């Protein structure tokens, strides 16, 4: 049987690293088994779903190389949900309810005060036909699924054996009074119709899974296998939000995080395997195993992405960055030498721009007061550009002879005068790239 997985985000905001974890696991399972990966946009919320978020989700996944085989939109399947709802009504598994949110809240509080679980009391099943007709006229009804009050069990791919007593769960609301089909129902219909065989999602969906198993069975379908990964928290243990901009994929991309660095961290975070940098999707897939992930909440610190990004960037061949370097205005003759000099001194590729500005426009000299006279003497001995690989050695030898300085007292002030920095690439490699020197003799 072909493995079919899906990633089903709601386009109500930009996706963050928590969403990515779900997407990556489902993508990896499909790709590793030669199966099908579906991107399904769960956009039945007409008020909050936006095309800009749908576009952003697809752009983020494309940036990461998480390609999909099929694109589905729930908004295109409303007729199918209506058909499935009709089937369940005729089977006696859908029933109409009329309580207002306030009335439901009062019932819930009363049960809690009595020390009982806040489970819906199925009062709507006891209404007469006359009462239903009257209430339907007065306020309109919403629809619940009638759960079989028995234990729902499955072997979870991460959490192990799961058993939930359906009697401890309220019959889920599947269609609102305004006709909007809710996630629990639409997702169940889609997963059966689309032949989904394996679903990985967050541990906050475990109860949903129990009810959806019954919904799928009531439709005559075979529920897929499930695995529920732990939820990510922020570095301090705080909950992640889809609208928490600093952890959205958009923001991480803007900060220069490389796709493979992000995927490498997410493919191992919360598992029994150590985090390591993968340079290709194939390397990542070879070591991926959903069974290695644990149930405990997992802390995500965005700062962990930058050592991985630095490692990834510094290992890139010139051919991978040639176009970016040329776009900075680096002459072809200097492009490859520039990369050799700059690559070990950048954290993200965006840092290349700063280095080329330094080389092409000159750096603001950093001159300590006690070195001012020394720098004036030294700069008087520096010829005009262009410079060659031998320039640094010849110049520092001349300065040493003229001033008597040597060692760090010679080299550090000269470096700071030319580059504005106390540390950096070898100056013998820097000199051929310098187009301008702003320090004066």
Swiss-Prot record:
A Pfam family that the UniProt record links to this protein: Anticodon_2
Catalysed transformations (reactions): tRNA(Glu) + L-glutamate + ATP = L-glutamyl-tRNA(Glu) + AMP + diphosphate
Q: Which domain of life is it from?
A: Bacteria
Which HAMAP family would you find in this protein's record? Glu_tRNA_synth_type1
Q: What is the lineage of its organism?
A: Bacteria, Pseudomonadati, Pseudomonadota, Alphaproteobacteria, Rhodobacterales
User: Position of motif 'HIGH' region?
Assistant: 9-19
Q: Does the keyword Protein biosynthesis apply?
A: yes
Similarity comment text for this entry:
Belongs to the class-I aminoacyl-tRNA synthetase family. Glutamate--tRNA ligase type 1 subfamily.
**Gene responsible for this protein:** gltX1
Q: Where does ATP bind?
A: 242
What does it do? Catalyzes the attachment of glutamate to tRNA(Glu) in a two-step reaction: glutamate is first activated by ATP to form Glu-AMP and then transferred to the acceptor end of tRNA(Glu).
**The UniProt record lists the keyword Nucleotide-binding:** yes
User: Annotated motif 'KMSKS' region: location in the chain?
Assistant: 239-243
Q: Name one GO cellular component term.
A: cytoplasm
Write down the species. Cereibacter sphaeroides (strain ATCC 17025 / ATH 2.4.3) (Rhodobacter sphaeroides)
Task: Give the record's GO biological process terms.
Answer: glutamyl-tRNA aminoacylation
Q: Which UniProt keywords apply?
A: Aminoacyl-tRNA synthetase, ATP-binding, Cytoplasm, Ligase, Nucleotide-binding, Protein biosynthesis
Question: What is the name attached to this protein's record?
Answer: Glutamate--tRNA ligase 1
Q: Which Gene Ontology MF annotations are present?
A: ATP binding; glutamate-tRNA ligase activity; tRNA binding
Record EC number: 6.1.1.17
List where in the cell it is found: Cytoplasm
Major location, coarse class?
cytoplasm
Task: Quote the subunit structure annotation.
Answer: Monomer.
């Amino acid at each position: 049987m072909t493995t079919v997985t899906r990633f089903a985000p709601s386009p109500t905001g930009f996706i963050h690293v928590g969403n990515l974890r779900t997407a990556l696991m489902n993508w990896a399972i499909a790709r590793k088994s030669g199966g099908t990966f579906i991107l399904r946009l769960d956009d039945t919320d007409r008020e909050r779903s936006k095309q800009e978020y749908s576009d952003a989700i697809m752009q983020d996944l494309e940036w990461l190389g998480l390609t999909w085989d099929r694109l589905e939109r729930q908004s295109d399947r409303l007729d199918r949900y209506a058909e499935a709802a009709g089937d369940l009504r005729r089977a006696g598994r859908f029933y109409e309810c009329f309580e207002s949110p306030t009335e439901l809240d009062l019932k819930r509080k009363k049960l809690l005060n009595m020390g009982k679980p806040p489970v819906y009391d199925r009062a709507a099943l006891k209404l007469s036909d006359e009462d239903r007709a009257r209430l339907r006229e007065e306020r309109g009804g919403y629809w619940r699924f009638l759960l079989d009050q028995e234990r729902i069990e499955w072997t979870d791919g991460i959490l192990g054996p799961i058993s939930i007593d359906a009697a401890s769960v309220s019959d889920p609301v599947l269609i609102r009074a305004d006709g909007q089909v809710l996630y629990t129902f639409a997702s169940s219909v889609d997963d059966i119709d689309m032949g989904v065989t394996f679903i990985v999602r967050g541990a906050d969906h475990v109860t949903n899974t129990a009810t959806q198993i019954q919904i799928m069975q009531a439709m005559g379908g075979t529920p897929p296998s499930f695995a529920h990964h732990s939820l990510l928290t922020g570095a301090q243990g705080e909950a992640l939000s889809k609208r928490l901009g600093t952890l959205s994929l958009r923001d991480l991309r803007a900060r220069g995080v490389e796709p493979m660095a992000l995927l490498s961290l997410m493919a191992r975070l919360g598992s029994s395997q150590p985090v390591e940098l993968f340079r290709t999707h194939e390397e990542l897939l070879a070591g991926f195993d959903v069974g290695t992930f644990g149930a405990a909440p997992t802390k995500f610190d965005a700062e962990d992405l930058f050592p991985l990004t630095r490692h990834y960037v510094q290992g890139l061949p010139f051919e991978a960055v040639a176009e970016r370097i040329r776009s900075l205005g680096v002459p072809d003759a200097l492009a490859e030498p520039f990369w050799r000099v700059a690559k070990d001194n950048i954290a993200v590729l965006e840092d290349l721009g700063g280095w080329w500005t330094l080389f092409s426009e000159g750096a603001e000299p950093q001159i300590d007061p006690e070195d001012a006279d020394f720098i004036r003497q030294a700069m008087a001995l520096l010829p005009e550009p262009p410079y060659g690989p031998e320039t640094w050695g010849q110049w520092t030898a001349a300065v040493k002879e003229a001033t008597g300085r040597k060692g760090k007292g010679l080299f550090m002030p000269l470096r700071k005068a030319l580059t504005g920095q106390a540390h950096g690439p070898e100056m013998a490699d820097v000199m051929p790239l310098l187009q301008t020197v702003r320090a004066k003799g």
